């Protein structure tokens, strides 16, 4: 009889813990108005994507963005406590602290970045790297203070030349940051390198 009680107790404990462990599954999506609308809207929508939720597929809240920002991508830091939003229309990067509700945008000035493309965060969650397509730069930032700390120029005659930086990956194990190139902002010239 004792093995049965132990089994029943263990099963009950597992089932109760799995119920307690369930959590929301949310997604952040950037959106903008269709062209030729009299009022341009841009923002971040937070959507419930848990198929078991009664709110599945519903937008739970919106974070408005400036209408001239042209938000491009959303990137998360390593522990998903912050979301970074790159912009094609301004020399600015936004960050949202996802541990503090209500969510608020914090602007990070990146004056050496003409068009913010991709962002990667170091494995220790202390540094972010932002590729800047229009200005041929990579901006290094302090991920704890959320401010730009250094501009790595990819313009010639620097040792590592890359035109129109786009994709970025970090591998701390080999102490490398890899940056790929793309086309120029006006689509007239193609980059063709990885640095």
Write out the residue ranges for each language-model feature.
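Positively charged n-region of N-terminal signal peptides that target proteins for export
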Residues: 1-6
């Amino acid at each position: 009889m004792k093995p049965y009680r132990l089994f029943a107790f263990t099963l009950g404990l597992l089932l109760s813990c799995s119920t307690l462990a369930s959590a929301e599954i949310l997604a952040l999506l950037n959106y903008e108005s269709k062209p030729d609308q009299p009022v341009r809207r841009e923002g971040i929508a937070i959507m419930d994507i848990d198929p078991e939720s009664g709110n599945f597929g519903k937008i739970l809240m919106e974070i408005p963005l400036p209408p001239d920002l042209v938000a491009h991508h959303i990137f998360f830091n390593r522990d998903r406590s912050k979301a970074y939003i790159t912009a094609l229309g301004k020399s600015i990067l936004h960050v949202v602290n996802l541990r503090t509700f209500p969510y608020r945008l914090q602007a990070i000035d990146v004056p050496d970045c003409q068009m913010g493309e991709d962002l990667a965060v170091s494995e220790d969650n202390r540094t972010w790297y932002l590729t800047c397509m229009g200005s041929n730069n990579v901006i290094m930032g302090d991920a704890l203070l959320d401010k730009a700390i250094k501009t790595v120029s990819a313009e010639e005659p620097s040792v590592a030349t890359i035109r129109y930086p786009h994709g970025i990956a970090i591998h701390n194990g080999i102490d490398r940051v890899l940056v790929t190139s793309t086309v120029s902002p006006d689509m007239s010239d193609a980059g063709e390198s990885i640095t």
